[in-house]
């Protein structure tokens, strides 16, 4: 069979007819050989990146006359299996499976098995050039000619792969086949950076699609039922035969338009289909009721249970995703199936370090293993009737036994024993934690308790209360009915184990919520707002205050519960919305702001003493004639903020030894202090011998890197890994620099780090330093928010922070001439460039020449209290200078802490 190129279009019709007749026998023989070859060969040839569905092969049920379509006159009657698409591609349509024994039975979709694109008739070349298989025969051809036409179409499709590789070689723009559309990916779940408006749009679109699909299914069901009743006069549940499926648009036996259905029947069927439509039927597993492990960003693998969308009160999950109800807190999330594992993968998903540190994770493990043991019929010893401390120990022992059972593979039943029973597979069964967890699950609490709750005098409760959103709703309802005092319940979670008062609003707070508040109160997102709700330090959806100088958030759950039903929607419609902390009124339903909340908030962080230490040694002031210059050891020195403040206070500095590894920071210190700083390199290379050689020291200061301590960093490694371990270098050198026994000379030290650190890390630092920290926010003495913890023995660290006349408290005071501040104070400036942007709309803080502008480096230096151009050395870029400032201390705060040292050391 002669091959033809793109230019062989002048051959006459008679010659093409002779060629086809001469090669007909060869093609039939070749077809027999091709049917014996495996169909996988066809998949390996041609363009790998594009999957094409070949024209369907006629079966015995379809008419024998081929339907031919021309490019200029497409009609409904002449449309064939390969209708022309605008981009020249073949329309992808499903075709009936060829019967056994038909010529195409051995091939998938009628595609050739080998020799693709080797020899092509001239008419096939022209047809493919036009983007469709076209022949010269009309629709009145005989059955024999139909077979020849089929062979010609198959041959034309053979050379499609080789032609496709040539097409577009000079550029996609000159090709008939246009550039494919870019693939759009969709990340399932609710990432924190998706705005509420976009999330609502997605949910509304999913809901519309689900309703539309339900209506179509209802109509099709009605059509099938009417057809079945007309044929057999009885209801048949079997599916209709394959020939009646609308897969072949050219088949005259298929009705393409559904018969009219009554309005009542249509509505009834639509409602029934919307309720009874199967859920999670995408063939990817993880059905309703299954126990799974789920992965969210920033969290370890967490145990959960697959639930129906009906339980969540939201819309259906998209295809390939599942609604998961998490154990421990009972919240819901949409998780893609790639981020799910069965509970039987306990050995690979269970994280021992998280179990040791996080009480909520321990509670979640306890709850899921309770459910697993109940399903598997595995019995564990129950908690005995005793006081609460013994109950907690019994729960601890039981939890350990269940974990060992899970790590052993859930024997003897194995993973099969974890399958949900039939009643839990019902999507409309309300299954909450307190219904499918044994009552002992509520007894679990992280031992030892910080403070024992009050015990009832009438009887000893066997277990603690079950705390969830419904518990808080019930207690708040009792408060509204004047049956309970709001100070007796934790307004954050609903617990009755109140240990202190909420620092901002009238109401109580439990120990767990106190720990969360300590961690999250000063944790901010990239938009400058709090990461969590001001009331409960949680919340799935939060309302952000519209006041530019306020950075607080309130979750919808707390607002609707404490302020009143519908208050959240009213706040959303109000623009701008002033939150309950900066509003004019002090009372909003049950949410009443405390009048003295600023001092209470300060005392909340100052008196959060989980551990009691002996008060630091108090040194009496040194007489003026006996005062000597100070000798300082500065670890993690940065840009020499300590030396700058000592000079500003007029304190004479005898020696300033600094440990720093950043070259830019060292350059700034050397240039601005004229070589008076002795740099000693990495803090890990400093030994006790060096301390004795350089000392004695009167003041040791430092602040280790906070990257692995701040809970803002989801990949943080904690105090004992990464840069967190550098704290122990400070502790080691502080111990070496302390005066010997019998030496009563004044000795002071100061250690600084972020407020947004884990409670356990803060507790460990305090235990090593044998001191509790004080929290100081630079917003009281500067134009920027910057809350930090300070440990030390400096005199008067707890005294109120007072500004001076030289402090620039407003951003406008820090700007150059002709520039207008849009905010009175800026958010915490960090090493990241986007920390300059302010508010939920990410505005730049300065307005100049009718345009928004960023802070200049000189203005940032004024915000931190540094002299103008303090970091302007060695041609450093703006970002490099911002990184230096983002790691530094606030000068007014350090001046406030160092001021009492004037009573002990010589001054100029």
Swiss-Prot record:
Segments of skewed composition (Basic and acidic residues): 14-37, 265-275
Chain intervals for the UniProt region annotation (Disordered): 1-183, 226-281, 443-462
Organism: Rattus norvegicus
Cross-link (Glycyl lysine isopeptide (Lys-Gly) (interchain with G-Cter in SUMO2)): 158
Every ADD domain range: 478-610
Region (Interaction with DNMT1 and DNMT3B) residue spans: 195-399
SMART domains, A to Z: PWWP (SM00293)
Recorded family membership: Belongs to the class I-like SAM-binding methyltransferase superfamily. C5-methyltransferase family.
UniProt protein name: DNA (cytosine-5)-methyltransferase 3A
Annotated PWWP domain residues: 257-315
Subunit details: Heterotetramer composed of 1 DNMT3A homodimer and 2 DNMT3L subunits (DNMT3L-DNMT3A-DNMT3A-DNMT3L). Interacts with DNMT1 and DNMT3B. Interacts with MPHOSPH8. Interacts with histone H3 that is not methylated at 'Lys-4' (H3K4). Binds the ZBTB18 transcriptional repressor. Interacts with SETDB1. Associates with HDAC1 through its ADD domain. Interacts with UHRF1. Interacts with the PRC2/EED-EZH2 complex. Interacts with UBC9, PIAS1 and PIAS2. Interacts with SPOCD1.
EC number(s) on file: 2.1.1.37, 2.1.1.-
